[in-house]
UniProtKB/Swiss-Prot annotation:
Record has Disulfide bond as a keyword: yes
Location of the protein in the cell: Secreted, Extracellular space, Apoplast
Keywords: Apoplast, Disulfide bond, Glycoprotein, Secreted, Signal
Primary role: Pectin methylesterase (PME) inhibitor that can target the root-expressed PME17 and PME3 in a pH-dependent manner, mainly in slightly acidic conditions (pH 6.3 and 5.0) but not at pH 7.5; this processus relies on changes in the protonation of amino acids involved in intermolecular and intramolecular interactions. Regulate de-methylesterification of pectins in roots and affects root growth.
Residues that carry a glycan: 16, 33, 43, 83
Organism, as annotated: Arabidopsis thaliana (Mouse-ear cress)
Alphabetized Gene3D superfamilies for the sequence: Invertase/pectin methylesterase inhibitor family protein
Protein name: Pectinesterase inhibitor 4
Length: 199
């Protein structure tokens, strides 16, 4: 079920991308209030309140720069992925200690989450080359979006085993909550990249 939600989130981001202005072309002086800029940017995401709550405290750093906006979102996304991975890893350790049949399912999920972290880090690294426009910049931006899309897919894959296998209800609840929150964050990051960076 969560995998369907993740795929739906990805589709929504790209379908709705044509409905929002490409802010990269907007002169920096257009937004005098940096907090307002962040709020406006977050309104282009699927979960605007979550987006604003995450990014508003960084508005003085982001200012009115779409690249700083997306880079900040990506860095926070990496942090969220690490936190979600920690939740699943702790459950895995408990399952191992109890010699539970859930071990293999949780291990697969942790592996997917590690891939998610790596992909988001790759996106952060690639963002360093997204500046100035032109064909090369466009290619780097495409790579960033690909890494983030892959991360979103892996987050959904993480929970596949919980749908197919026998898992403790409480364990499933904790994992789904952690991954669901992460998927929303990643969806927002992808939306910001899609709506606010275009060359």
């Amino acid at each position: 079920m969560l995998r369907f939600v993740v795929l739906s989130l990805t589709l929504m981001v790209f379908i709705n991308s044509s409905n929002f202005p490409k802010t990269a072309a907007t002169p920096p002086g257009t937004y005098q209030n940096h907090t307002t800029y962040v709020k406006t940017a977050c309104n282009s995401t699927t979960y605007p309140t979550m987006c604003y709550n995450c990014l508003s405290s960084y508005s003085s750093t982001i200012k009115s720069d779409p690249i700083k906006l997306c880079t900040t979102s990506l860095n926070l996304n990496v942090k969220s992925a690490k936190n979600a991975t920690l939740v699943v890893s702790n459950l895995l350790q408990k399952a191992k200690a109890a010699k539970s049949h859930e071990v293999s399912i949780l291990k697969d999920c942790v592996d997917e989450m590690k891939d998610t972290i790596d992909e988001l880090k790759q996106a952060v690294a690639e963002m360093k080359y997204v500046r100035g426009g032109g064909k090369t910049t466009e290619e780097h931006l495409k790579n960033v979006k690909t890494w983030v899309s892959s991360a979103l897919t892996d987050e959904g894959t993480c929970t596949d085993g919980f749908e197919e296998g026998r898992v403790n209800v409480e364990t499933k609840k904790k994992v789904k909550k952690a991954i669901s929150e992460l998927s929303k964050t990643t969806s927002n990051t992808l939306a910001l990249l899609t709506h606010y960076l275009s060359y």
